[in-house]
């Protein structure tokens, strides 16, 4: 369909995430050196390794981790990218990723964090906000249920980055609100 052809940014993001995941598999051990070199942790940021804010957003610690994030990215990308356009969708994704990184650094500054979950939570929250702005209760849609289920999983399973998920969701909700419902209209 036309909408499926227009999800270029979504496809590129999925390809990058899968590439980085496969690249980290080339190493050995439970936590290989490549994962360690890309992960987010405040001591590394304080040491000037700012690239980790971006690299950690493409790093995944297992097949289930990358698989779930890419499944949600694919579904949310099909919904949001045709509505927002490529540039705004990319901006929403990366703003949410940065929000997730900030949340992770605030709550677990010395932990090693990675994954696209912050960005994906931002996309879920933006979609929920967009539905609400249009008079659709997001809790009566798959988006609302998916967001709630993922938040429950976030708080129920140890080792999941609560700060990353919540930081991404808050950022996505705010940026999504601004993008999906302009508060100012032009008058001539």
Regions inferred by a protein language model and the residue ranges of each:
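A detector for small-residue-rich transmembrane helices and their helix-helix packing motifs
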Residues: 1-188
